[in-house]
Amino acid sequence: MKQLIVNSVATVALASLVAGCFEPPPATTTQTGFRGLSMGEVLHPATVKAKKERDAQYPPALAAVKAEGPPVSQVYKNVKVLGNLTEAEFLRTMTAITEWVSPQEGCTYCHDENNLASEAKYPYVVARRMLEMTRAINTNWTQHVAQTGVTCYTCHRGTPLPPYVRYLEPTLPLNNRETPTHVERVETRSGYVVRLAKYTAYSALNYDPFTMFLANDKRQVRVVPQTALPLVGVSRGKERRPLSDAYATFALMMSISDSLGTNCTFCHNAQTFESWGKKSTPQRAIAWWGIRMVRDLNMNYLAPLNASLPASRLGRQGEAPQADCRTCHQGVTKPLFGASRLKDYPELGPIKAAAK
């Protein structure tokens, strides 16, 4: 009887585990390549519906204003990023940013109500850099964001800290049961520890490929060899790349797939994953640019913020929050299902000539 109870508990636990890792049927498949080659995008209608309802909560665009009057930098003090706008454009943009980032906290989340030009609050300094980053994305990374662009809401979704940011994780020994920040579950298998993280789709792979590939631009993601033996095309200098590099690459791929809410063949050819050109889908080239965009954001905009952020906003190694694909995409192939919010706020796009 005791053994029966133990077996029943184990069965229920296993069922709960499996149910938590997979989406329930039905699933739909849209053919994306030649028939019979397993080229298709797999989606779950219930999940897609829930995400569409979530993304439909975007605050409506504020009424447009006339671009008349002197530059706002001549009206207010310490306006260093949006100083080329008119006062009306500036106030409209500031109001929108408040709705996107701190709707509960209001303007005083960033500003001192007695001195709006004061930099005493750290969000003021951070917000300035994030505005520069947003403009840089919309100006320099159109290979990835096209003309759709991004706004503060793309990542923040109504919260001061975007819901999907991550922190760098220390490399832990295989027998160390410490749980890193974004690891949801730790299990012991055959004498070593398996860390299962939502960010890598609960795969038993490298739980932090982001530090290796997205926090710097020194590491090559490509790991599949061009020949069987000897391994050609994936060497690191004169050394062959270790198996751990393959684990990290596939963990990153699992993360990208999960972040976009799609499967591998959205970008890759089912027959030959490593091939480019006509054998890959157009989305793969867009993803290639996206990886390099995220590296730029992490290295040049986010990582340097560690000097401006309080300890409560820093990771265990004293680092600022980092971005990955999920930060913007949040489970869909195009953030906000491709709806362009930049068209309503062109002030966040490429810098235009100052008002006269």
Swiss-Prot record:
NCBIfam families for this protein: photo_cyt_PufC
Classification via InterPro entries: Multihaem_cyt_PRC_cyt_su-like, Multihaem_cyt_sf, Photosyn_RC_cyt_c-su
Gene knockout outcome: Lack of photosynthesis.
PROSITE patterns listed in its UniProt record: MULTIHEME_CYTC, PROKAR_LIPOPROTEIN
Annotated lipid attachment (S-diacylglycerol cysteine): 21
Membrane topology: Lipid-anchor
Protein name: Photosynthetic reaction center cytochrome c subunit
Signal peptide extent: 1-20
Subcellular location: Cellular chromatophore membrane
Primary gene name: pufC
